[in-house]
Amino acid sequence: MKTTSFGKIEWQLDEAGRDAVAKQLGIGKAAFHLSNQSSTDNLLLPGYRLPEGVHVFDSIGDVQRFISPYRLQQSDDWINGTFEYDSAQLEEELSRLKAVFPFLHISVIGHSVLDTPIYEIRTEPVQHLHSIHLNASFHANEWITTSVLLKWLKSLCLAASDPVQARHYEAVHILQTTALSIVPMVNPDGVDLVRNGPESLGLHREEFTLLNGGYTDYREWKANIRGVDLNNQFPAYWEIEYYRHQSKAPSYRDYPGREPLTEPEAKAMANLALRKRFDRLIALHTQGEEIYWGFLGHEPAISKETVKRFELVSGYKPIQYLDSYAGYRDWFIYQFHNEGYTVELGLGKNPLSMDQFDSIYEKTKRLLWEACKC
């Protein structure tokens, strides 16, 4: 994935020098330090969308004059706009995110059935007090969750980078103390199928029409490209999900596979959690305006208080127990006894219309900010 360095300064910066430069350029100190901690001669400027290329300057004053027109504002289209993503568009967006907010770390945690990368976006705080995982688009026709999550992330990063933003100090605290892990598109093949059709993936429509119940419209497709529901793939009473469904074969929805963790996307997500043992997990789905927060009594006591805060800021209804098993959140709670929440965004029938986006985002952004408070 392409990244670009901007603003090359031909001298070493000590810590005091970094603070002075950040102040003169109007960049939050934490974002500036985290962006430049491994750089000695390339000055990386979070919160600026600069033209590509390496630009050489003689002084910080020259840098300040050059970058001034390129500072991002909360009202800018890239920050405040509404974007829809397939896997290719996601990759382009991640490249922009890395260029504009260099303190973000982007890596591949696995690959889909069709070898599409599954990306994780990370923050690496100086003082690691908490770890929080957020994910979206486990289900293919719930791709609007990716749009919501990335818009919120851009808002968080801009607030951390710009001291005049209303949530600057809150964002700085998150950046300094919380290791964020974000997987914006768990099911890239499925999203591509729903958004672009099988031909875009080099696949035959006839095969997928059979899996899709005879329909050539893929808007209701939830599964991965092999017809396995990724959110029924985890070893947390998986057998219940397997035996309760009449279909024992791949399908556009609900089929849990022949056994747990057969699918590369599910394996990647399980391995990520096993490596990092997050303190809190938030899985974004649609729809229902509900928050599922318990699993058979394995959830920690603090979950009850946390979900009350989520309800207060979002208006979403907390539901402790649900007749559902083998989901990522279910397994996470069962495996680690840590906080796990499935947040069902919006109301209606999947895929939700983008006409709902603004309403969904307003409620969800408040919940996500709250989720980063530990």
Predicted features by range, described:
Residues 31-34, 55-118:
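Short glycine- and acidic-rich boundary segments immediately preceding or forming the N-terminal edge
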Residues 144, 151-153, 157-292:
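Active-site/substrate-binding loop(s) of hydrolase catalytic cores
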Residues 1-28, 48-67:
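Primarily a LysM-type cell-wall glycan-binding module
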Residues 33-43:
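Short acidic beta-strand-loop surface patches of small beta-rich interaction domains
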Residues 116-118, 125-131:
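Proline/glycine-enriched tight loop/beta-turn segments at coil->beta junctions
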